[in-house]
Amino acid sequence: MRLITKMFLAACCSLVVATPALGQNTDAESVDKQSTQEETKTMPKPEQFLGKCVGKWQGTVKTWFEPGKLVDESKVSGEIVSLLNGNFFRHTYEGSMKGKPRHGEETLAMNGITKKFQICWFDDFHMSGAILISEGDSIERGFSVSGKYDWAPGKPQGGWRTDYELKDSDHLTITAYNIMPNGEEAKAVETVYERVKEYPINSPSQSSPSNQP
């Protein structure tokens, strides 16, 4: 796998708290508590997370070749589908990078024994005929997985961390970080998705023409 500027080229080419009177609860506290409870209810359990991501998505993807230096921002479209009775999921996407077409695919799963998330990823821009295998744990709104890749013969491997986060049911962010051999991290790729709303079967735009004049 190539790093930008060697390592980066292969990877990316990557209180203020008001105290109420004793024994009293402010309206704001009640609202915050209710909001937190509602948010907790809507968050999918780790084993349900991938299923909540199924659907068609569109948005933007940003790429950094070096820390803090944004080199590309472009449109991206993707789809996540369920495979083999929901035991596996496939994420396919297409977009562009500096005007050139870019395509990629991920196979995702949650290991039923270890309860860890696992991803197998390949991409026609970031890879050099290699497959990146990553594994990790759930986080508050999704999961975070890490893997290693080769960027030059005889050199220490680089690391790659990917975070999947559902902001809500219609907004998914996938952020990848390049990890140098010394442990330093830098944001490499950020995909911000919005769910594509598809017409319901019985919507007026797809219903049969009226028989009445």
What positions do the PLM features span?
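Low-complexity, intrinsically disordered short peptide segments enriched in small/polar/basic residues
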Residues: 1, 13-14, 28
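Sec/Tat signal peptide C-region and signal peptidase I cleavage site
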Residues: 19-23
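Bacterial N-terminal signal peptides that target proteins for export
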Residues: 1-9
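Hydrophobic small-molecule pocket/channel-lining residues, especially in calycin-type beta-barrels
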Residues: 24-213
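Bacterial N-terminal signal peptides
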Residues: 9-18
